UniProtKB/Swiss-Prot annotation:
Record site feature (Important for dimerization), residues: 270
Cellular location(s): Cytoplasm
Gene3D superfamilies membership: Diaminopimelate Epimerase, Chain A, domain 1
Catalytic class of the enzyme: isomerase
Protein name from the UniProt record: Diaminopimelate epimerase
Active site: 75 (proton donor), 219 (proton acceptor)
Annotated GO biological process: lysine biosynthetic process via diaminopimelate
Subunit annotation: Homodimer.
Lineage of the species this protein comes from: Bacteria, Pseudomonadati, Pseudomonadota, Gammaproteobacteria, Aeromonadales
Amino acid sequence: MLIDFSKMHGLGNDFMVVDGVTQKVFFSNDVIKKLADRHFGIGFDQLLLVEPPYDPELDFHYRIFNADGSEVEQCGNGARCFARFVRLKGLINRDRIAVSTARGRISLQLEGENQVTVNMGVPQFEPGKIPFRAQKAEKTYLLRAQEHTVMCGVVSMGNPHCVIEVPSVADAPVETLGAIMERHERFPERVNVGFMEMVNATEIRLRVFERGVGETLACGTGACAAAVIGISQGKLKERVTVSLPGGKLTIAWKGPGQPVYMTGPAEHVFDGQIEL
């Protein structure tokens, strides 16, 4: 069976995007792993699947699969590419798009010059909603992981994030400590690990080790999580520029109970077909 797809990226965080509205598709874990292989497949960080809405009040349902085949709840860079994809493919003729994910609803707004603003929803600090094993919510936690002792902030942006402040992201042990923290026993669903360097009150540098993927050039939910942690700790202002290896995102958050807004690019690379 031939499947149409598009290759897209948000700041180098790359995706295979598939229309599951006009074509019937099913992807097993093994198939996703093969497609994700950068030597023998298409190559991507995540596969994004556009499905008909589960709720008639919404436009689409948004599913995300990591390169290891695992399904995850949210992907911010993917959300921007999702919005541009459905518009490019004529699946919708509006610039404001409402979708559901495994963890709730998000709204997408197409802007000019391939920019998309995403309402990422309200961040969750309650341990049970992250999920994270702790008796109560704290602004920082001290975690021990093998020979490391880590001070971090923990939050859910629809998926779990652990944010570690470092003096320099260039020297941060992203691959080693990221892999250890991803599977820390206090995160029952594993965790995305961000390494954040404070530049000033309106700018940070960030590298992210994504669960099920490893380090990526950009992570939208990771950028949101880092900004939210910095703002909640009183170190950052309400609007933050996040510099990632793949480029920059703008994150805005007014505080507890308020949604996080992320603005950044979504690029279409090519269209293709593949036999499944």
